Curated annotation (Swiss-Prot):
It comes from the Bacteria. This is Urease accessory protein UreF. The lineage of its organism: Bacteria, Bacillati, Cyanobacteriota, Cyanophyceae, Synechococcales. HAMAP family: UreF (MF_01385). One of its GO terms (molecular function) is nickel cation binding. It is found in: Cytoplasm. Belongs to the UreF family. InterPro entries: UreF, UreF_sf. Its main location: cytoplasm. One of its GO terms (cellular component) is cytoplasm. UreD, UreF and UreG form a complex that acts as a GTP-hydrolysis-dependent molecular chaperone, activating the urease apoprotein by helping to assemble the nickel containing metallocenter of UreC. The UreE protein probably delivers the nickel. Keywords: Chaperone, Cytoplasm, Nickel insertion. Required for maturation of urease via the functional incorporation of the urease nickel metallocenter.
Amino acid sequence: MSKSHLLKYLLISPNLPVGGFCYSEGLESYLNTKDLKDSNSVKELIISELKIGQIRLDARLLLDFFDIFNELNEDKNFKNNLQKLLSLDKWILSSKDSVEMRAQQIQMANSLFDLNKEFGFEYLYKKNKKNSWPLAWSWSCYCFEITKLEMVETFLYAWSANQLSAALRIIPIGSTKAQLIQRDLLEIISKVSREIMDKEIDDIYFGNVGLAMAQQNHNELYTKLFRN
């Protein structure tokens, strides 16, 4: 088995700087409105986001970035591909509904680019001043020679694990319950990942505005909870 199969765990390990990020992404607002009260409601929220949330668009964009990296590496249509890369990166970052979410994306991307550099995979191309998390994730997977399906799966797994880590602190749901939820999410993560692999960006539907609205009310709360 290729070591690239194991390198993906560097990206999702909660003990490393990348996986160690713990952002609540609006969960406190749900908690305050009593929409988030136990492990079942947490599980339902995460499943809803995986099925119709914006995280699907982020995951789909990983594939476009990955393909562009291949083209750039082979020096095919270099100027056009680089411009497309920069435009997509700026677009997905600007699509975030709150200043806090954009700041989260930028911080996580910068940290992952720094980690990649330490691994010997410094980013080779021109970047925007502010970069998106999907761009950094795709670059890591490209450098680690992780398959595109595994790239999407680990991205969604890491996102869901992050939400559960936040829920552990703010509800709390208990670590055993969180593990059970993560286990139950594996099937939906696998299904959604394969669906995304078969779709173009324009075919990705997302319509869950609840979390987006909640995110705009959570900046002070998550700062208190997760600054350390």
